[in-house]
């Protein structure tokens, strides 16, 4: 979310792997391998259709130890989280939603981790991107608000880190409510706050969603500016 250069992230992961291999801590080594596969997926040039189907295969996960299966819960949270994020990046929103729901089964094991932000943020957006004002039911609203309310609370405590994410999810909510002018304002707010905070991936996503919405509203010039 910070927008660090992927080459630098990969170098940090490789250093972490070199250290962890000396300690024989299998779960942490697996998590680092998951992160490495995710970064490599983002770095790989695309030819043809971009899909996350093979980004994080099931064989990345070792069999859980019989004597302490609960020890793998945090690792499983990260696995399904990163797999869901990879699907989201490719626009495979239904697959992203399914994987993020599985991550939610293990979210209890990662209290205080910043990755909970990614879980709630992408869970809300993976669902909202599949919906239209006509299909936005009360059940879907509750599901999105389950994630949005968490981020809104964090944004009140630490707006510098969370307010841009709150604005982007809120833009999606009011888009689904048919309040187009407010949605445009919130997309713009998300663009501005993510730029000011240096959150480059969120800024790019905010521009993309704002551009798609502007085009759907009949504003091609504004849409082109975002893209």
Predicted regions and their residues:
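Helix-coil-helix junctions within alpha-helical repeat/solenoid scaffolds
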Residues: 2-227
């Amino acid at each position: 979310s910070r927008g660090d250069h992927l080459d630098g992230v990969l170098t940090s992961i490789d250093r972490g792997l070199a250290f962890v291999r000396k300690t024989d801590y299998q779960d942490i080594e697996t998590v680092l391998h998951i992160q490495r596969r995710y970064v490599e997926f983002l770095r790989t040039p695309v030819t043809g259709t971009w899909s996350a189907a093979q980004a994080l295969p099931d064989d990345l996960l070792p069999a859980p130890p019989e004597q302490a299966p609960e020890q793998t819960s945090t690792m499983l949270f990260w696995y399904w989280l990163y797999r869901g994020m990879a699907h989201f990046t490719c626009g495979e929103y239904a697959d992203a939603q399914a994987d993020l729901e599985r991550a939610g089964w293990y979210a209890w094991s990662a209290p205080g981790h910043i990755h909970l932000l990614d879980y709630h943020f992408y869970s809300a957006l993976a669902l909202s991107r599949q919906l239209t004002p006509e299909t936005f039911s009360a059940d879907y609203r509750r599901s999105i608000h389950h994630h949005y309310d968490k981020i809104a609370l964090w944004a009140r405590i630490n707006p510098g880190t969370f307010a841009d994410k709150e604005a982007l999810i809120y833009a999606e909510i009011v888009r689904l409510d048919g309040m187009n002018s407010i949605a445009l304002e919130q997309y713009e707010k998300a663009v501005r706050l993510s730029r000011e905070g240096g959150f480059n991936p969120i800024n790019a996503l905010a521009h993309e969603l704002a551009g798609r919405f502007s085009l759907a509203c009949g504003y091609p010039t504004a849409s082109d500016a975002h893209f």
